[in-house]
């Protein structure tokens, strides 16, 4: 019967390796991370096309509205005698209503598609992470706390999903809206368009400066959150040990320390990223005022020149249309700024996710590895000059040799930390030895498939672990094909 994995003994690697977790965070590469996030879109190209078309239609409806409003002012209102042509005005109002309804519907299509696809992508990433974590070596779990892994599995995936959904829709709308708005503004007044476009370099400069500061704080925030989850999980699962040694205050102090680091990194991330929105609003209002003043001058002046260049006069309706376009021109960039926190968190979370997905197990089967079969296995075990250490340069076992023949009952005794659990961990090839060899029936276990080697072993854990399921499920966990009679006999 295949047995479950061995838990760390008191002399095992324990938590002394887990402090290495934060050091294993890979360097940030935002460009590659973003490209990798969107690589998940390949199999959802049809929805991508639908959202692109919907985005174009929404932008078209949005851009047509200011033109109609300008026409209403110029064609429906006679400023000389203050009269209104309600017949024309009613037609324009109905057209505006249809445009706004259509714009809302196309926006809903985008949101529906993005929600649908982002949930599917999140599901795929969770599946990939689960597969990857189950194939990892035991050493992987020595250097990552369970809380940190759970944080990546839940919080980081959720952050990535949220950032992916919001930012992707915003990306489409920003590009299309900016392009369409600039074209419409140039058609109305090239000179005023130049004034508005002067704000673009300022926006990108502010975003670049702030993003460099916030990205590291968001990443630090996620690392601290993982450490906090790990400490809470260990404190709860090991509550008897904590109580037995009376170290409640020590755990509280450690929790408070990590919690404070989480607070500091969170505050810094939010403060720095929060600067962008107020700055964007100030810039938006400044541009709006400048356009309004210049537009008023152009509407009332019959012969206006700037640096010797003649500036065409414009109507009141054109000014109104242009002011609306000014808002639309800055709004997409403004909206990107409002999603800045989510995007930064998504990138930081994605990097932590991809770190797990890119981690390859070091203990693998050789291409020509043999498969042990139950009917041919005898069970002779030989440790031949075996040396091993969990950490480089720190050996737990030094030049150990012994033989356990078929049907022999062997007891391994020793003080805490002597290496009893380590011997079993090496026999099941949860770790690879530093030197020497371990053989089963004369075959080096490194030449045997891991799965067939462990299939021939029955292991009783030092601390039994029960899954949240039935008694039958737990008893037959290592042997799913067991009959009810076999389960009862084993119990």
Task: Outline where the language-model segments fall.
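Membrane-integrated ABC transporters
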Residues: 1-62, 77-92, 110-114, 118, ...
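A hydrophobic transmembrane-helix motif
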Residues: 64-66, 70, 169-211, 267-320
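Helix-loop junctions and hydrophobic alpha-helical segments within the transmembrane domains
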Residues: 129, 133, 242, 353, ...
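An intracellular "coupling" helix at the cytosolic face of ABC transporter transmembrane type-1 domains
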Residues: 38, 43, 138-139, 157-164, ...
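ABC-type nucleotide-binding domain
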Residues: 358, 365-368, 372-491
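Transmembrane helix-loop-helix hairpins at lipid-water interfaces of multipass membrane proteins
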Residues: 48-106, 186-191, 293, 300-313
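Cytosolic ends of transmembrane helices, especially the final helix of ABC transmembrane type-1 domains
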Residues: 115, 243-247, 271, 280, ...
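Juxtamembrane helix-loop junctions of ABC transporter transmembrane domains
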Residues: 22-30, 53-54, 61-77, 99-146, ...
């Amino acid at each position: 019967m295949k047995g479950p994995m061995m838990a760390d003994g008191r002399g095992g690697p324990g938590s002394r390796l887990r402090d290495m977790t934060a050091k294993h965070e890979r360097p940030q590469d935002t460009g590659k991370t973003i490209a990798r996030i969107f690589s998940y879109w390949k199999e959802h190209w049809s929805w991508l096309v639908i959202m692109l078309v919907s985005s174009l239609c929404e932008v078209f409806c949005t851009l047509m509205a200011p033109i109609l409003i300008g026409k209403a002012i110029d064609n429906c209102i006679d400023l000389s005698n203050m009269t209104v042509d309600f017949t024309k005005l009613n037609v324009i109002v109905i057209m505006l209503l249809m445009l706004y309804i259509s714009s809302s519907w196309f926006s809903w299509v985008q949101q529906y598609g993005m929600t649908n696809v982002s949930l599917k992508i999140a599901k795929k990433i969770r599946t990939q992470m689960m597969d990857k974590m189950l194939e990892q070596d035991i050493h992987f779990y020595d250097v990552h706390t369970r809380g940190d892994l759970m944080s990546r599995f839940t919080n980081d995936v959720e952050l990535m999903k949220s950032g992916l959904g919001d930012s992707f829709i915003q990306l489409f709308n920003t590009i299309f809206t900016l392009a369409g708005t600039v074209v419409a503004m140039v058609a109305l007044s090239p000179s005023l368009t130049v004034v508005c476009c002067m704000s673009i370099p300022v926006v990108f400069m502010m975003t670049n400066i702030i993003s460099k500061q916030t990205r590291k704080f968001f990443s630090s925030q996620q690392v601290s959150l993982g450490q906090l989850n790990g400490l809470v999980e260990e404190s709860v699962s090991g509550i008897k040990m904590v109580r037995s040694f009376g170290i409640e205050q020590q755990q509280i102090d450690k929790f408070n320390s990590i919690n404070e680091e989480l607070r500091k990194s969170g505050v810094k991330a939010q403060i720095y990223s929060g600067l962008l929105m107020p700055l964007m609003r100030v810039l938006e209002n400044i541009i709006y005022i400048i356009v309004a003043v210049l537009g008023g001058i152009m509407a009332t002046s019959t012969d206006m020149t700037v640096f010797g260049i003649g500036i065409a006069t414009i109507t009141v309706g054109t000014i109104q249309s242009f002011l609306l376009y000014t808002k639309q021109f800055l709004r997409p960039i403004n909206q990107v700024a409002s999603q800045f926190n989510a995007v930064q968190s998504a990138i930081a979370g994605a990097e932590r996710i991809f770190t797990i997905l890119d981690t390859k197990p070091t203990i693998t089967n050789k291409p020509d590895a043999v498969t042990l079969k139950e009917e041919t296995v005898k069970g002779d075990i030989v440790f031949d000059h075996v040396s091993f250490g969990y950490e480089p340069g720190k050996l737990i076992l030094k030049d150990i040799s012994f033989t356990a023949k078929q049907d022999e009952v062997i007891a391994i005794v020793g003080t805490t930390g002597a290496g009893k659990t380590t011997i079993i961990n090496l026999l099941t090839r949860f770790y690879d030895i530093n030197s020497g060899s371990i053989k089963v029936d004369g075959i080096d276990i490194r030449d045997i498939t891991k799965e067939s080697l462990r299939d021939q072993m029955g292991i009783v854990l030092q601390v039994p672990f029960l899954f949240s399921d039935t008694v039958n499920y737990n008893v037959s966990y290592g042997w799913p094909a067991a009959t009810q009679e076999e389960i009862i006999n084993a119990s």
